[in-house]
């Protein structure tokens, strides 16, 4: 296709006239810009690019070299303001032809360089859609730039590098070209990624080992390319990391090689797969180069730039050291790093550091922290231990474990020294457990306890707390105490008797209890998380010291029990606030196990202070993470004869008892494990009553004798065995506060041990079948008898459960009947009272009704008399003369006809009176009984 402007204008007119492109799967909107032909002629002269290509391809003697160069010069002059995207493919074809001629015709170097130089200018687009339309052409053109780096021409290579660098520093066009727009710089960068230019540049860098200038330009290009994650991935595939790192120490008076190489390595680590980069750098060649560079910068680097570069190299080394396969020891780098880390604290005769000194500047301060950090990483390789001993690392680090001396001239500022002190203590936590003999020879325990004592005192020493390790320690010594306790915990949990015995002889138990009390007495502060960690570590250290030692448990004593009880009284809501409280509670439960259980005095004091109640309160919170540990403690505590009374006396919410709580936990555990039970909690499978869903999924397979089976592992993996043990020690027969549902579950718990034995024998039987073994007759009978006995126990328990469920159902029916009977009696009583009231109203309002009632009353009285009158008996008339009212008119009525001894006193009990309604009707009243006149002292007013 001709790229002459006339042809281009004709093509544009044809496209604008309605021709649709079919090369793309989707329609791309095309926008044309109409401009006068005169203006176009002023910018781009007609140029037949196909003609130029044809001329360059001809090898006839008729076509002179001068003619070819003239065509190229015209091309360069025509496109002096930049290349249009639509012509890019043909222009790079011309560039490729020029490059092919360079080897035999060096005169083509200059025009090729000029074309490449123009590529550094912004590309031009005539339509908005050009960026999409010519994507492939542009990407292929940039890929060709990478291929041209193989041409042995220094000028051409440098020009290519300058061109690529210009992609990242694009400047706007100096002259506006009508009808064209500048392509954005991001488009070029994107096309570089698509074209894979980064990979080609890495390959060219590996070829330029002896050409320093060209190599520096390539590194500059790679420095720009490595800012993209896509390019970094391509560079990693081309082994850029190892190739660049291996030549870090190449001669370079300018110092640019080291700077640019380290910058590229940094970008690769940040923007691509770190694991793959580490793998590439973990070879002897790369580490030797890093070692020499670091040593030179450490010993001879004095400028700010050199110190900063030294620290960057150390960070890269630290990342490589995380790979266990890196030959850090073999190349001697580990020994040098240990020397550099300790020479300031432990004097060394090594000529490398004999006259060396660190200064109070930011770079040297950062270097010191980085050296502490890399020691922590290096010590993970046990082969480093001897080097740490030779380097006296423990002694060097312990120089920081002391209170600051005010009058001594310090190499570091107060804030810097504080941060280095915390780094050193944190490093000791990793190194000291590996070097116990060196730790003891440096009197490590004595130094730590003395420093802890200083941390516990309040004085005017001001803590800055302005570092990662100093978090939460501003204005106090929490940070120092926190890291010192971490160090002490690391040493105690080695379980080395020499270390622990020495600590106990120095009074560490009492000192730790005092530290905990001090933390308890402090008001709630912003550093709550730090305070919780300090308390947790204190309890863990005490647990590590006291476990299995009765004398140390006695030293823990009542003061220790008091701090444990204090933590257990924490508001349960705090457990929902974060990890700190959970860790503290775990540490507390661990200290109960290690520091209290087994010491009878401490156990009794714990019980006396209602410690069991607090344990059950925590258990009732239904926090699964605590249940296993608490139940284990309960099992051990129940060996104390005083525990049962405390457990049975405990009451939770809604009068919940300990036994009922344990049974509820059992039911919840079985539900989570998928044990088969019916809706009433009854056994479903009498052959395997304890089987979980996991056990059913697992197929039985023959196991070695020393390997526990699934049934045995089940005992350790859930809390059912512990619940059984606690209830067994509490006595199954005398458990208070149980419901019928609890009793149904209790039947299973009571037989847990029998069922578990049956499970194991079932496994034995299945394994025998799988291995196709045949038992002798007596053994086979015994095995079958055991399995049958287990099944019979299951049937018996199921039968007992059914009986309990039926009895409970009957009891529920009877209770319901009693309730309904009471309701019916109440209604009947209410109806009788209403009827009595209606009769009363009728008698008072109707004379006939009153007369009728009077006749009924008289008839009732007469019918109640004896038919034969007794001798000497007093006869009372039914009708009393002078009585003109049918109801009492006052509050007091005097009854003179009936003696008090016959009535049994005043009718003051209304409920009793209601049981037998008066025949006379009317409202019930209290009456005053008036005795005869001859006994006035016994009259009782009511």
From Swiss-Prot:
InterPro entries for this protein: ARM-like, ARM-type_fold, CFA69, CFA69_ARM_dom
Biased composition range(s): Low complexity: 1-16
Q: Biological process GO terms, please? A: flagellated sperm motility; olfactory behavior; positive regulation of fertilization; positive regulation of flagellated sperm motility; response to odorant; sensory perception of smell; sperm axoneme assembly
Reading the lineage from the top rank, the first entry is Eukaryota
Q: Which keywords appear in this protein's UniProt record, sorted alphabetically?
A: Cell projection, Cilium, Differentiation, Flagellum, Olfaction, Sensory transduction, Spermatogenesis
Q: What happens when the gene is disrupted?
A: Male mice are infertile due to disrupted sperm flagellum assembly.
Question: Which Pfam family, any one of them, does this sequence belong to?
Answer: CFA69_ARM_rpt
What are the annotated GO cellular component locations? axonemal central pair projection; cytoplasm; non-motile cilium; sperm midpiece
The record's section on PANTHER family has: CILIA- AND FLAGELLA-ASSOCIATED PROTEIN 69 (PTHR14716:SF0)
What name does UniProt use for this protein?
Answer: Cilia- and flagella-associated protein 69
This protein's species is: Mus musculus
């Amino acid at each position: 296709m001709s790229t002459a402007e006339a042809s281009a204008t004709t093509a544009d007119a044809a496209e604008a006239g309605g021709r649709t492109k079919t090369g793309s799967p989707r329609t791309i909107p095309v926008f044309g810009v109409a401009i006068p032909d005169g203006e176009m002629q002023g910018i781009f002269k007609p140029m037949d690019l196909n003609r130029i290509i044809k001329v360059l391809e001809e090898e006839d003697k008729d076509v002179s070299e001068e003619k070819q160069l003239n065509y190229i010069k015209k091309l360069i002059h025509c496109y002096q303001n930049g290349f249009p995207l639509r012509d890019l493919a043909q222009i790079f074809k011309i560039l490729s032809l020029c490059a092919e001629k360079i080897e035999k015709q060096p005169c083509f170097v200059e025009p090729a360089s000029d074309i490449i130089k123009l590529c550094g200018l912004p590309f031009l687009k005539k339509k908005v859609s050009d960026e999409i339309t010519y994507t492939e052409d542009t990407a292929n053109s940039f890929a060709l730039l990478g291929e041209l780096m193989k041409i042995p021409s220094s000028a051409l290579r440098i020009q290519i590098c300058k061109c690529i660098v210009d992609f990242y520093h694009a400047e706007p066009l100096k002259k506006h070209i009508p009808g064209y727009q500048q392509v954005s710089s991001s488009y070029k960068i994107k096309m570089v990624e698509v074209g894979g230019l980064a990979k080609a540049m890495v390959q060219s860098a590996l070829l330029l080992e002896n050409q320093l200038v060209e190599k520096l330009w390539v590194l500059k290009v790679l420095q720009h390319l490595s800012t993209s994650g896509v390019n970094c991935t391509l560079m990693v595939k081309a082994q850029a990391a190892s190739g660049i790192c291996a030549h870090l120490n190449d001669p370079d008076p300018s110092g640019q090689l080291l700077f640019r190489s380290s910058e590229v390595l940094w970008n690769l680590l940040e923007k691509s797969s770190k694991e793959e980069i580490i793998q590439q750098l973990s070879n002897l060649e790369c580490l030797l180069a890093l070692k020499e560079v670091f040593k030179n910068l450490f010993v001879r680097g004095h400028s700010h730039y050199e110190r900063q570069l030294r620290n960057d190299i150390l960070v890269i080394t630290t990342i490589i050291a995380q790979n266990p396969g890196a030959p850090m020891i073999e190349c001697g780098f580990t020994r040098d790093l240990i020397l550099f880390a300790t020479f300031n604290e432990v004097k060394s005769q090594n000529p490398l550091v004999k006259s060396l000194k660190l200064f109070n500047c930011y770079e040297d301060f950062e270097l010191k922290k980085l050296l502490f950090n890399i020691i922590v990483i290096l010590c993970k390789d046990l082969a480093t231990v001897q080097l740490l001993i030779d380097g006296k690392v423990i002694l060097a680090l312990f120089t920081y474990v002391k209170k600051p001396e005010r009058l001594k001239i310090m190499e570091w500022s107060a804030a810097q020294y504080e941060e280095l002190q915390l780094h050193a203590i944190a490093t000791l936590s990793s190194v000291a457990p590996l070097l116990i003999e060196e730790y003891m020879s440096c009197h490590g325990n004595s130094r730590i306890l003395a420093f802890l004592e200083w941390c516990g005192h309040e004085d005017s020493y001001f803590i800055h707390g302005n570092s990662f390790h100093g978090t939460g320690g501003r204005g106090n010594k929490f940070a120092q105490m926190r890291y010192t306790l971490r160090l002490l915990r690391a040493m105690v949990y080695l379980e080395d008797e020499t270390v622990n015995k020495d600590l106990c002889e120095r009074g560490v138990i009492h000192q730790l209890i005092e530290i905990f009390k001090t933390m308890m007495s402090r008001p709630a502060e912003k550093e709550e998380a730090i305070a919780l960690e300090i308390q947790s570590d204190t309890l863990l250290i005490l647990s590590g010291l006291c476990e299995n030692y009765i004398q140390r448990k006695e030293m823990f004593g009542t003061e220790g029990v008091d701090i444990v009880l204090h933590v257990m009284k924490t508001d349960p809501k705090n457990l929902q606030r974060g990890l700190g409280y959970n860790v503290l509670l775990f540490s507390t439960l661990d200290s109960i196990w290690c520091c209290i259980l087994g010491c009878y005095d401490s156990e009794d004091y714990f019980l006396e202070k209602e410690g069991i109640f607090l344990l059950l309160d925590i258990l009732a919170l239904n926090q699964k993470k605590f249940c296993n540990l608490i139940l284990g403690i309960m099992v051990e505590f129940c060996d104390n004869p005083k525990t049962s009374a405390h457990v049975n006396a405990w009451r939770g919410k809604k009068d919940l008892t300990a036994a009922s709580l344990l049974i509820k936990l059992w039911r919840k555990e079985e539900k989570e494990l998928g044990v088969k039970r019916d809706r009433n909690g009854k056994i479903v499978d009498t052959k395997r009553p304890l089987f979980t869903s996991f056990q059913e999924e697992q197929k039985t397979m023959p196991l070695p004798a020393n390997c526990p089976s699934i049934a045995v592992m089940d005992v350790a993996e859930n809390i059912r065995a512990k619940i059984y043990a606690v209830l067994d020690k509490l006595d199954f027969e005398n458990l208070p506060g149980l419901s019928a549902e609890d009793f149904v579950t209790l039947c299973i718990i009571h037989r847990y041990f029998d069922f578990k034995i049956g499970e194991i024998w079932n496994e034995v039987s299945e394994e025998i079948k799988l291995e196709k073994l045949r038992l002798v007759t007596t053994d086979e009978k015994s095995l079958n008898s055991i399995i049958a006995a287990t099944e019979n126990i299951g049937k018996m328990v199921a039968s007992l459960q059914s009986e309990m469920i039926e009895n409970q159902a009957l009891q529920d029916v009877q209770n319901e009947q009693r309730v309904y009977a009471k309701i019916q009696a109440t209604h009947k009583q209410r109806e009788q009272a209403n009827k009595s009231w209606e009769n009363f109203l009728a008698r008072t309002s109707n004379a006939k009704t009153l007369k009728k009632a009077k006749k009924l009353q008289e008839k009732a009285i007469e019918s109640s008399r004896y038919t034969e009158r007794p001798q000497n008996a007093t006869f009372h008339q039914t009708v009393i003369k002078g009585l003109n009212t049918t109801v009492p008119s006052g509050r007091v009525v005097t009854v003179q006809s009936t003696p008090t001894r016959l009535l049994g006193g005043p009718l003051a009990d209304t409920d009793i009176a209601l049981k037998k309604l008066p025949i006379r009707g009317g409202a019930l009243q209290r009456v005053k009984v008036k005795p005869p006149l001859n006994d006035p002292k016994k009259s009782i007013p009511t």
